[in-house]
Amino acid sequence: MVGYALAIACATMGSPAAGSPAARADAPSCIEYDNAYKLEWQASWAVYQAGQQNPDDGRSSIVVDLPITIDAPLDKVWSVYSDLQNDLGRHPFLKGLVTHRTCDDGDFQVIDFTALEDIPMGPITYPGHTEAEQRINEAEHYYTSESWDLPNVTTHQLITFTDNGDGSTTVNEHITFVADAALIQFTADNGADSHRAYQNALKADIENGTL
C-alpha cells in the first residue's frame, strides 16, 4: 500500500513526524472553520491515522494510473485542477464540500475537508461522507490527497503535472485504493470510473474556456 505522510493534522491527533516537511518548516499559518461536520471529520480522521499505523490490516489494494493530456499551458491546468471547488458539478458522485481547516507552512497548503457524495451501489445510492486531506505543493506542481470513508475504504492519490513543451499539459492521477477483499474491485472500478469522468469534464471546460 502506498502512503503519503500527513504533514498537518488536527492538533488533537498528533504532530508531524520528525523529518517531514512540516516538522522542518516554521509553524504553519492555519484557519479553522466551524461547521456541522467538523467533529465527524476529526473522529474519522483518527480512525484513518490509526489504520496508517497498521498497514498489514488484511485489506487489499489496487493501484491505477489515470493520465490525461489537456490542450492548455501548465500554469492554467494547474490552477484549475488543484482547486477543489472545480470538482463540484464535474465529479459524478460529489454533491458538496465542507472545509474544516486550511494551513500554509510555506511549502504546502493543506486543506482538511469532508466530501459529501452520492455513491451508486447497484440499485441504491449510498450517501457517503469522505473525510480527506489535500496537500498542495505549488512550487513543484503536484499535490496529494488522502481520504477515508465507510466501510473502511482508504484512497491515496498523487497528482502530477507535466509540461509537454507544445502548449499542452499531461496530468497523471496515481491512485491507490485500499478496501476489504470483498469490496476492493468494486471500489477501484467505481473510483477509477468517477475520476475519469471528472478528468474529462475538467479537460473539456479548460479547453472550451469555461474554466
Give the role of each language-model region.
Residues 1-9:
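Sec-dependent N-terminal signal peptides
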Residues 146-196:
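Beta-strand/loop substructures that line and gate deep hydrophobic ligand-binding cavities in soluble
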Residues 71-75, 102-107, 135-141, 160-170:
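A short, structured loop/turn motif at beta-sheet edges
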